[in-house]
Amino acid sequence: MFEVEALVEKNRLVVRIWGDVDGEEARRVGDAAVGVIDRLRPDFDLLSDLQGVTALHAEALVQLRRIMEAARARGFRRVVRVVGRSVDAALRFERTSRELGYDAYLAFSLEEAERLLDGGG
């Protein structure tokens, strides 16, 4: 399952995914995220919450690349990834991030990630 939200007032894209993410769902996440990026101003932040991911299809990495290419074209500033106990998903996303030339800050809870992005820690 997933949820994608453009927080226009905070200039932030929030992507939450949890459970088993198959190829079709990964494509829907990509479509939803790419579809709302244009609602954000340049220098937006991206918060991805993976802490509830239990299984991740390889298509998720293809969609991560797609989302980040759209984010780069729009002009993102920072990425914070909430990993919780989803170590496998975190490692796979981190490898892809490095291949794309950016580093994501890691957080262990949504609250910690929001504090980081809001400038409080």
Language-model features: locations:
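Amphipathic, Lys/Arg-enriched alpha-helical "gate/interface" segment within cytosolic domains
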Residues: 1-121
